[in-house]
Amino acid sequence: MGPKSTNNLCETFGYLSAQTATKLAHSIRRGLAYGEQTITDTNLLEIQIAHPSEVCVHKFNSRTERKSGADWEWWFVDGPSNRGIGLRVQAKKMDKQRNYSAFKESQCQALLHDAATYSPECFPFYCFYNWWWPESEIGPECHCGQRAGSAAFGCSVLPAQIVLDDSGPKCDR
């Protein structure tokens, strides 16, 4: 069961992030496959179903991904003005050793280059699919005084340049 179509986009992202973290943790604990492509396909579909007029999604095939460095492109659109902002996104899944072993610097460089030369220009990002077990409270306090649970970081985004500068992220939690 996916997010309700009455949710705002932020609530949908939060719901899918928690679902990603939970399902990924369960799959690793049980030794079952829950692949990066499955997570991507499921989340993109849920977002498109819940917010068809706010988000335009274009998923790249493997040939286009090799050239662009991106798994998908998002356009967040302001309906009345028909203006939007574009993101080129590459996904990486945390493995059972809590690393992003599939990270390739050449792919990150392709993502940065392709997003900058595409017209209209898109912003290059990574979306990291993360898991923790057991779930814990991590991160800074929110404006409401509460800490976010680790499930809130199930889908975490970072600008691609930061990822490249960090030479491939690792998590030691």
Language model features with spans:
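Extended charged low-complexity segments that act as oligomerization/scaffolding linkers
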Residues: M1, E11-T20, E105-Q109, D114
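Acidic-basic catalytic patches of nuclease active cores, encompassing PD-(D/E)XK
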Residues: T6-H58
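Gram-negative outer-membrane beta-barrel domains
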Residues: N43, S81-N82
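Alpha-helix termini
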Residues: I49-P52, V77-S81
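Active-site metal-binding core of divalent-cation-utilizing nuclease and nuclease-like domains
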Residues: H58-S68, V77-G79
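Conserved catalytic cores of phosphodiester-cleaving nucleases, focusing on short active-site segments
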Residues: W72, I85-K93
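Residue-level signal for short segments within beta-strands and strand-turn junctions
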Residues: F76-D78, K93, N130
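Acidic, metal/cofactor-coordinating or nucleic-acid-engaging core segments within structured domains
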Residues: R98-R173
